[in-house]
């Protein structure tokens, strides 16, 4: 931005930002090479809106914009102690947003995105009305956000990825929320946002100022497991896989030995979706990890941090995937099937293994209801050599962020909604059976405008639920949310799989995915963390989306064609451009 090449302009802009309470005025001047005189004129005009009572312009003391935002938000201030962070507005406040309709989002009869338990509670508790500008599925969401950014059609608050955050910061489209956050975040919200030692807050910080609220989560929740159809294993007299060789032998057997016993050649071994990784369902991240490859994160090699997607171990995994594809162990049409289409195959009994997230059984719970013999079990990522356990790659604690538009009239309302979501879902006054997951299995946790969660709470819940089911603890040790999981898991154990009961058992019960992840990766330290956790650099924001797209295209072509020289060409191109 040419305006920042002028030292006087930079000083004036900082001054205007201060007297306007943090409004990012770069938006008024973005991508225009202004002279010092033009900037001074603009400063004078904007200064008229911040006059003192006697008609003079306020002259505040210059602020230090290099303050560490983590410490300010974590500790708060004397003024923040005087703010009722749950106070209801006297007059209605409207907040506009957009929605990523996540996997399996459903509403009780009569409810909708516009009218549900959370939108009603916003109005009841805070007098805030939510206006959804648009909504779309996960696969289209990033594209629609890009269009909104390009057209400058920004709602009051929306969820963005790291590259989009950097783009909007550079464009001056988002608000500096340092003071708003400091004054309005509830203590519990501050605690959760800083639960990773401040890394998430650092990723949302530019030049010492906070420009987004990180959608903090648990990196461990991004670890993958291998889901296997154990009824097919039983039919063929096979054991659960422990090594890569075991996995590949099972894939061959599931493809060639009629595991469903219907006498028809209609099954294959490993489910894969068209984008290979990123969906969490039929996601090859775990397959790559089995080969000690980590294609979607930055990896610490000791003396340098490198992109995992161009390391030599990836080539070995690609060779194996092509062999499996050529042998019919992977759907020949995987390249055109999104996760929903792959799920149709899995639910219809055409596939027997897939790598994915802990929640994957949510998508096929209905298939379990129709056929109780339909049984899947999660196992840890197989070991390559049978001796050294595989390490699961973990994303950063924050990969998405909530940004507030520079034009938002009530930025504190967004913070209030976040406080409310966290408190009613996980705080001392939580009602998880209403605001998290209902007894009927509706995931109301998907409905809020903004939401975060304590990073380890699901793993704690799984340990406690499993202990009670195993008779090692009393049900009275469970909180309301955990009791809900326990009751649903018990129903599934008794043969009642409806209302997502089986899905809850497969997450929280004995042998469930959360326990597999915690015991095999976390306790033993078998993880590879994303080594980059700051806000994206200018080069990252500009080049990484294009390079990632090229990576996906080249990986897919290699699986289909088996030309491993393309990987070497891809690496050379990456190093040249990146």
Per-segment meaning from a language model:
Residues 101-117, 220-227, 234-240, 274-327, ...:
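Extracytoplasmic/periplasmic substrate-binding proteins
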Residues 129-135, 333, 377-379:
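General small-molecule cofactor/ligand-binding pocket signal
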Residues 43-47:
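C-terminal motif of bacterial Sec signal peptides marking the signal peptidase cleavage site
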Residues 205-279, 299-345, 350, 402-439, ...:
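Helix-loop-helix "hinge/cap" segment bordering the ligand-binding cleft or interdomain interface
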Residues 32-40:
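Sec-dependent N-terminal signal peptides
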Residues 155-159, 352-357:
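Paired acidic/hydrophobic, glycine-rich loop segments that form the ligand-binding mouth/hinge
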Residues 4-6, 11-20, 28, 34, ...:
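Conserved N-terminal structural module of periplasmic/extracytoplasmic solute-binding proteins
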Residues 424-554:
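Conserved small-residue motifs centered on glycine
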């Amino acid at each position: 931005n040419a305006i920042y090449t002028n030292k006087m302009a930079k000083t004036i802009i900082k001054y205007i930002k201060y007297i306007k309470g943090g409004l990012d005025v770069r938006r008024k001047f973005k991508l225009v090479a202004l002279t010092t005189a033009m900037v001074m004129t603009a400063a004078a005009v904007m200064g008229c809106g911040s006059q003192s009572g006697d008609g003079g312009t306020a002259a505040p003391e210059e602020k230090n914009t290099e303050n560490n935002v983590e410490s300010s938000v974590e500790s708060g201030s004397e003024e923040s102690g005087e703010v009722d962070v749950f106070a209801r507005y006297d007059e209605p406040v409207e907040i506009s947003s957009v929605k990523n309709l996540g996997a399996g989002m459903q509403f009780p009869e009569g409810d909708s995105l516009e009218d549900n338990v959370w939108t009603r509670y916003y109005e009841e508790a805070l007098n805030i009305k939510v206006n959804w500008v648009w909504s779309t599925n996960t696969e289209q969401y990033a594209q629609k956000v890009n269009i909104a950014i390009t057209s400058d059609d920004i709602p009051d608050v929306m969820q963005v990825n790291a590259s989009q955050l950097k783009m909007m910061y550079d464009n001056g489209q988002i608000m500096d929320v340092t003071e708003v956050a400091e004054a309005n975040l509830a203590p519990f919200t501050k605690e959760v946002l800083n639960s990773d030692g401040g890394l998430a807050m650092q990723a949302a910080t530019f030049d010492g100022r906070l420009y987004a609220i990180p959608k903090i989560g648990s990196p461990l929740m991004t670890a993958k497991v291998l889901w296997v159809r154990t009824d097919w294993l039983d039919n063929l007299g096979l054991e659960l896989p422990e090594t890569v060789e075991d996995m590949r032998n099972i894939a061959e057997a599931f493809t060639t030995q009629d595991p469903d016993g219907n006498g028809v050649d209609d099954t294959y071994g490993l489910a894969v979706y068209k984008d290979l990784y990123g969906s969490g369902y039929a996601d090859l991240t775990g397959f790559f990890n089995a080969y000690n490859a980590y294609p979607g994160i930055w990896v610490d090699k000791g003396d340098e941090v490198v992109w995992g997607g161009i390391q030599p171990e990836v080539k070995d995994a690609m060779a194996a995937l092509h062999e499996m594809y050529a042998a019919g162990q992977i759907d020949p049409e995987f390249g055109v099937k999104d996760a929903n289409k792959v799920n149709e195959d899995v639910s219809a009994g055409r596939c027997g293994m897939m790598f994915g997230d802990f929640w994957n059984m949510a998508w096929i719970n209905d298939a379990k209801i129709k056929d109780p013999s339909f049984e899947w079990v999660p196992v840890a990522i197989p070991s390559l050599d049978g001796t050294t356990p595989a390490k699961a790659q973990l994303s950063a604690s924050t990969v998405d962020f909530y940004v507030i538009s520079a034009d938002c009239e009530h930025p504190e309302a967004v913070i209030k909604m976040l406080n409310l979501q966290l408190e009613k879902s996980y705080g001392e006054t939580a009602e998880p059976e209403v605001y998290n997951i209902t007894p009927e299995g509706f995931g109301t946790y998907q409905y809020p405008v903004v939401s975060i969660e304590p990073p380890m709470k699901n793993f704690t819940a799984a340990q406690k639920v499993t202990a009670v089911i195993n008779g090692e603890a009393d049900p009275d040790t469970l909180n309301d949310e955990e009791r809900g999981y326990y009751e649903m898991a018990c129903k599934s154990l008794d043969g009642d799989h409806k209302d997502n009961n089986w899905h809850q058992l497969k997450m929280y019960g004995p042998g469930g995915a959360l326990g597999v992840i915690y015991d095999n990766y976390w306790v033993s330290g078998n993880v590879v963390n994303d080594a980059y956790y700051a806000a994206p650099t200018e080069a990252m924001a500009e080049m990484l989306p294009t390079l990632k797209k090229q990576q996906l295209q080249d990986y897919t072509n290699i699986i289909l064609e088996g030309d491993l020289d393309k990987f070497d060409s891809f690496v050379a191109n990456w190093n040249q451009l990146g």
